[in-house]
Amino acid sequence: SLLNPNLNANMKSVIVIGSGFAGLSSATFLAKSGYDVTVLEKNDSLGGRARVWESEGFKFDMGPSWYWMPDVFERYFKSFGYEVSELYELVRLDPSYRVVFGPNEHEDQSANMAELEAMFDRLDPGSSKRLRKFLAEAAYKYEVGIKDLVHKPSRSLLEFADLRIIKGLFQLDLLKNMRKHVAEVSTHPKLKAIMEFPVLFLGALPQNTPALYSLMNYADMSLGTWYPKGGMHKIIEAMVKVAKEQGVKFRTETEVKGFQYSGKKIVGVLTKTGGFSADIVVAGADYYHIDQEVSDKDRREYSKQYWD
């Protein structure tokens, strides 16, 4: 976790590849810890997938369209002395979204829990009671999974030697998969599709995903779907503001094409316009892109077949 980067600030210079959420977050926390940070972005504007495209007076989000888990953003901005409300205005969407099953066949996901439960009971009488139990368990998983596990640096198992965490592991459903867990609420095909849907954000299949990730259903159904007025780029604008206040420097239209090495250590990056040396290089771009297109062939972690 870069919330408490336990790094040696004597290693002063840092290059961050990419100005998406991950790159900006890394850059701001490292700069706050005393590093000299430069972000390199290949596009002509900042934001990575969350950049904005403007044409004929219209603005279009180029990537994310939903704002989930608002507490994560609140935690980030509070680390730099800001409330989210000082930087952009959030609106909770109702319905959260529409699930389309076919021509003239859809279900709206209400932001109102009573209406959501009524929809479950309409499709599968009695299922709302099981949904409440499911979400109560998911809320616990969210509390432990996000607040006690995700925000730890994961450098040592000793970080997790906490009685609350150890006790909590037995309630996280690590040995059950999401498909079976969802079936405990309902086997109705539409409800199963609605409840399994958030797992897709993990790039996984429900049958291969631990039931721990029902915490995503809690994020969806209980915490809600939000949208920043003015578009997703408002978040990027806020993060760039914070980054610049911390002293982060930005270079757009600077695509990283390769790494500079000294033995096994990366000591810089190569671009079309020249090289940039750094004590630390943080890759905020896609894993595939870094592994297959930026790293030298003999230094790639995975084969092309693995990615295919």
Predicted features along the sequence, with ranges:
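Rossmann-like flavin
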Residues: 102-210
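N-terminal amphipathic/basic-hydrophobic helices that include classical n-h-c signal peptides
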Residues: 1-10
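A conserved short coil-to-beta-strand element within the FAD-binding core of flavoproteins
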Residues: 252-266
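Conserved acidic residues
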Residues: 13, 267, 279
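Short beta-strand to alpha-helix junction loop
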Residues: 169-178, 221-241
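Glycine-rich loop(s) and the adjacent beta-strand/alpha-helix scaffold that form part
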Residues: 225, 229-238, 245, 259, ...
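N-terminal glycine-rich phosphate/pyrophosphate-binding loop and immediately adjacent elements
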Residues: 12-143
